[in-house]
Curated annotation (Swiss-Prot):
Subunit structure, as described in the record: Interacts with NIP1 and NIP2.
Annotated source species: Arabidopsis thaliana (Mouse-ear cress)
Record carries keyword Mitochondrion: yes
Chain residue ranges for the region called Disordered: 307-326
Pfam hit, one: RNA_pol
Gene behind this protein: RPOT2
One of the GO biological process terms: DNA-templated transcription
Reported function: DNA-dependent RNA polymerase catalyzes the transcription of DNA into RNA using the four ribonucleoside triphosphates as substrates.
Principal EC category: transferase
Reaction(s) this enzyme catalyzes, per UniProt: RNA(n) + a ribonucleoside 5'-triphosphate = RNA(n+1) + diphosphate
One annotated Gene Ontology cellular component of this protein: chloroplast
Annotated EC: 2.7.7.6
Name by which UniProt lists this protein: DNA-directed RNA polymerase 2, chloroplastic/mitochondrial
């Protein structure tokens, strides 16, 4: 080739591609004199331009890139191999000339190059190959595949680079954390199995078993026999000797991994959902089956990815083999279809498709078989000091037995349970640190939500909503346009992007208390209550009392056992995460749109212990305002009435206890332990430590604070009702209107109840029998007596519910004699309390009744109540009659529940008012979260409690008030009624209840609305 014929892209020819200039010499293949491909390529280019330009909305400048000319890349004088167009130009030997075109125009051109135009172009190429030159088809296919792969790789690289920039990480650090996160999600079971294999080897060679912790020795003892039993099942299936429908599912994972999953899942279920050391077979089987399904799905995905990478490197040899296998399978299926053997076809398809969710029957059968094998192979031996003779006391670790259901609905029905040996049960309390927990806090920011099952964890199954099998809700969510759900996606992403870390100083104190036996700072006692000895008597009364005491002691011990297991799991997560600089909590939501962190054990939605050991990973300078809010926050956590003072009163409380605060920080367990008197002791301790550090600094305002400061709603459900009804009286009671100090709605109701009872007490008992009860209750009425009833009034609490709540409070006080007297007093007090609530919150009660009437009308037509939240989330109430399906498993016949088409009218009616209000408080939190992100304010939230750094509390307070006013400036009730009328045009709905004249903007100036 002469210099005069220098091909395109060399220096003297760059004018043809005026958007790009060369940086490196491109790869150009040698001319092939016998090739007949050049006319075909020229044809393709012309057709691509003429047929695709309009459809793809390509600018004229971009179309110039592909003009066929004597100097074109399709010149007859050379064969040009395309540069990879799937990545940005600057990454493939070209750079942009920003002066040539406007930024917007070039972005369109670049987009065309990186996918849109290429797809239109190559689709035409494929058509042309079919009609003119079949020999070129592999080259076109190769081009297509390479472009697709490169685009996908570049998209992933771009996303990861954005994440690194967004979260302030260097590339190497981010990649290391990413790899660790992938391992946590995909290799935990494999790692545990490898550890057991290694321990078995060490035990055989060095006899290390006695040195293992008790729980780990149990797992190790069960691992090998269970693994061998599973391997035997797998071998029978491979030899064609097993006809069980679950067999091919068990053959998709190694036996050692299945063994580990089965052991840990059953033990985990006993820890979290067990009742006195036993779990229902149906629940345990579905839990184990679900875990196996998820692991198969992850492994299948990773295997496909690995094979794809290997095929790319090996030139597709393995891919050809795979194609042959697929072709063979297709022929076999077609033959069976012709013979009408559809059941055989179904089994083949099920056994070769592991991406689709399993049906409930399969999960139950797989889980039941694995539990059956564990029950058969797992044994336990009593410690030597507990054996009566020289023979070892070896017995099954688990027993499959049956219990009889109690209660009016299922009385007399038997159900299967797996019951663990008392020694296993004792070990459960210490097994948290050895539990395999894939759903941990994430080391990298969660994937952004983009669909029902797209977001959060990198590999673990993640759903944006916990539907609990509610089909209509799931379908409504999947069918909603993505644009409609974008505000919800953004809010959940915002909550998931908050960085957390473990407060090591608080965790150290927690560990010291726990290792010393607990029973401090609301931690459960690690010891059991001793069972009373049987009295040496035949007196029936004494024996009856003894039996009652034994039953009570066992109940207490059972509750303590559950609490100890729960605490152990929380501390296990805290210990695993304590050395991480930062971690993240991916969030999803319930069907009403309330957000929840997905990791189940240690999260900020949990107890005081959880909140005390968690803090923001990012520290921000306190500033003068932040120091003030930190002091107020400490008073709020101390509570005991202090939290009902004005903000200045709370500030004074903290400043009057500085010596106690310093002592708590310096000597939390050796000093006066003032922090233990707080209502939330561990959170109080965390603030004591932070405040001490700040006040001892020469410049307290510059000290970095990691403590989340809470701003809590005042009986938030009633706040939403007051805003809906524009109810001035109700608004004053729940702090929508400004006051000198916070209004206490519970004290307000208690005062009204006391006024009514005083009037009743003055009446003649012969005319009004309740007068005697009123007189006896006068000294019992306080905010605690009525608090639960007021709180649950927003949930539509009934008279019976209120009566039972007040009855429990009265029994705690022991001022009443027999059960009959307590019951009568509770009946009277419940009526008076509900009357006082009706009087104070007339608008709220009217709206509640309207909600109930509308729901009843809809449900009476056997329709579910559904609505769309202000953020665009479709909500469908899931209350349907449950049907049962009997599934025969290898262990027993299980009764699986499933949703029927018949709605539960009463449940649809009673649940609608609280569910609708919860959907509104969820919307308020999400709106606040997104606004905080845009304002640069760190945000975390727990329903009606909003958290941020001390320095940003003032900003948060402005934002949350503005968003509340914005939310209720919408015609929410009008929109709801309109949606009902559009969905059910044949039904008549009652008119909207009358509303008051409250100006919602007063919320903007109310200091105690959230405080």
């Amino acid at each position: 080739m002469s210099s005069a014929q220098t091909p395109l892209f060399l220096a003297n020819q760059t004018k043809v591609f005026d958007h790009l200039i060369p940086l490196h010499k491109p790869f150009i293949s040698s001319p092939n004199p016998v090739s007949q491909s050049f006319p075909m390529w020229r044809n393709i280019a012309k057709q691509a331009i003429s047929r695709s330009a309009a459809r793809l909305n390509v600018s004229s400048q971009t179309r110039g890139l592909l003009v066929s000319s004597p100097e074109s890349i399709f010149s007859k004088n050379l064969s040009f191999r395309f540069p990879v167009l799937g990545s940005p130009c600057h990454g493939k030997g070209f750079r942009c000339l920003s002066g040539i075109t406007r930024r917007e125009e070039f972005s369109k051109s670049e987009r065309c190059l990186s996918g849109t135009l290429a797809r239109g172009y190559t689709s035409v190429a494929e058509e042309e190959v079919l009609s003119t030159d079949v020999e070129e088809e592999p080259e076109v296919d190769e081009l297509l595949k390479e472009m697709k792969k490169e685009k996908k790789r570049e998209s992933h690289r771009s996303w990861r680079m954005k994440k690194q920039d967004q979260f302030g990480m260097g590339r190497t650090k981010f990649q290391n954390l990413w790899r660790r996160q992938v391992k946590i999600e995909t290799e935990e079971w494999e790692r545990a199995a490898a550890e057991y294999m290694e321990l078995l080897t060490d035990m055989c060679e060095q006899k290390l078993a006695p040195n293992l912790p008790y729980v780990k020795s149990l797992f190790l003892g069960w691992f090998e026999p269970l693994r061998d039993a599973i391997a035997k099942d797998q071998e029978l299936y491979r030899l064609g000797k097993s006809k069980a429908t679950y067999a091919h599912y068990l053959d998709q994972l190694p036996a050692d991994k299945i063994s580990v999953i089965t052991m840990h899942k059953l033990m985990g279920h006993l820890m979290t959902g067990g009742d006195n050391g036993c779990v229902k077979v149906v629940h345990a089987a579905c839990t184990v089956g679900d875990a196996i399904e998820q692991e198969i799905r992850i492994c299948t995905f990773l295997d496909k990815k690995k094979k794809g990478d290997d095929n790319e490197e090996s030139g597709g040899v393995e891919n050809e083999t795979s194609m042959k296998e697929q072709d063979k399978l297709r022929k076999k299926v077609n033959e069976l279809i012709k013979k009408q053997k559809l059941s055989a076809v179904r089994k083949i398809l099920q056994s070769h498709d592991y991406t689709k969710p399993w049906i409930a029957d399969v999960r139950a059968k797989v889980g039941s078989r694995l539990i059956e094998l564990l029950v058969r192979t797992a044994y336990i031996q009593s410690p030597a000091d507990q054996q009566d003779n020289d023979l070892p006391d070896v017995r099954p670790a688990f027993v499959h037995t049956f219990k009889v259901a109690k209660g009016s609905m299922n009385s007399g029905r038997k159900y299967g349970v797996i019951e663990c040996d008392p020694l296993v049960r004792k070990g459960l309390e210490k097994s948290g640190r050895y539990a395999v927990m894939p759903y941990m806090p994430m080391l990298v920011p969660p994937l952004k939500w983009s669909g029902y099952d797209k977001g959060a964890y990198l590999f673990l199954t993640s759903y944006i909503m916990k539907t609990h099998g509610a089909k209509q809700q799931r379908e409504a969510l999947k069918s909603a346009p993505k644009g409609q759900l974008q505000p919800v996606f953004e809010a959940l992403d915002t909550l998931g992007s908050t960085k957390w870390r473990v407060n090591k100083r608080v965790l150290t104190v927690v560990d010291r208390i726990w290792s010393s036996g607990g029973c401090v700072a609301d931690m459960v006692d690690r010891s059991d209550v001793p069972l009373p000895e049987k009295p040496d008597t035949e007196d029936e009364g004494i024996l009856k009392k003894w039996k009652w005491e034994v039953k009570s002691a066992k109940k207490v011990n059972s509750e303590r056992h559950s609490q100890r297991c729960d605490t152990e799991l929380k501390l296990s997560v805290a210990r695993k995460m304590k050395d991480e600089e930062a971690f993240y909590y991916p969030h999803n939501m319930d069907f009403r749109g309330r957000a929840y962190p997905m990791p189940p054990h240690l999260n900020h939605l949990g107890s005081d212990l959880c909140r005390g050991v968690l803090e923001f990973a990012e520290g921000r300078p306190m500033g003068i305002s932040g120091l003030r809010w930190l002091k107020i926050h400490l008073a709020n956590l101390y509570a005991g009435g202090v939290d009902k003072l004005s903000l200045d009163g709370r500030l004074a409380f903290t400043e009057n206890h500085l010596d106690d605060i310093f002592d708590s920080a310096d000597r939390p367990l050796e000093g006066s332990r003032w922090w233990l008197q707080a209502e939330d002791p561990f959170q109080c301790l965390a603030v004591c430590i932070s405040l001490t550090e700040a006040l001892r600094s020469p410049s307290p305002e510059t000290v970095l604070s990691h403590i989340p400061i809470h701003q809590d709603g005042s009986c938030n459900g009633l706040q939403h009702y007051a805003a809906l009804g524009r109810d001035t009286l109700g608004a004053e009671a729940v702090n929508l209107v400004a006051g000198e100090k916070p209004a206490d709605v519970y004290s307000g109701i208690a005062t009204r109840v006391l006024d009514i009872m005083r009037r009743d007490a003055d009446r003649d008992p012969e005319v009004f029998p309740e007068a005697l009860r009123a007189r006896k209750l006068l000294n019992q009425v306080d905010r605690k007596l009525v608090k639960q009833t007021v709180m649950t009034s927003v949930y539509g609490v009934t008279y019976i519910g209120a009566r039972d709540q007040i009855k429990r409070r009265l029994k705690e006080r022991s001022d009443f004699g027999d059960e009959k007297e307590v019951f009568g007093a509770a009946c009277y007090a419940a009526k008076v309390t509900l009357a006082a609530i009706d009087e104070m919150f007339q608008a709220a009660r009217a709206i509640m009744r309207w909600f109930g009437e509308c729901a009843k009308i809809i449900a009476s037509e056997n329709e579910t109540v559904r609505w769309t939240t202000p953020l665009g989330l479709p909500v469908v109430q899931p209350y349907h009659q449950m049907g049962t399906k009997l599934v025969k498993t290898s262990l027993q016949t299980l009764s699986l529940q499933h949703e029927t088409d018949q709605v539960i009218v009463r449940r649809q009616r009673t649940a609608f008012p609280p569910n609708f209000i919860h959907s509104l408080d969820g919307s308020h939190m999400m709106m606040t979260a997104v606004a905080c992100k845009r304002a640069g304010v760190c945000f975390a939230g727990v329903h009606d409690s909003f958290w941020t750094h001390a320095c940003d509390v003032d900003k948060l307070n402005i934002i949350l008030r503005e968003k509340f006013v914005e939310l209720y400036s919408q015609p929410i009730l009008e929109n709801l009624l309109e949606s009902f009328e559009q969905s059910f045009p044949h039904l008549d709905f009652p008119p909207l209840p009358e509303r008051g004249d409250l100006d919602l903007k007063v919320v903007l100036d109310s200091p105690y609305f959230f405080n």
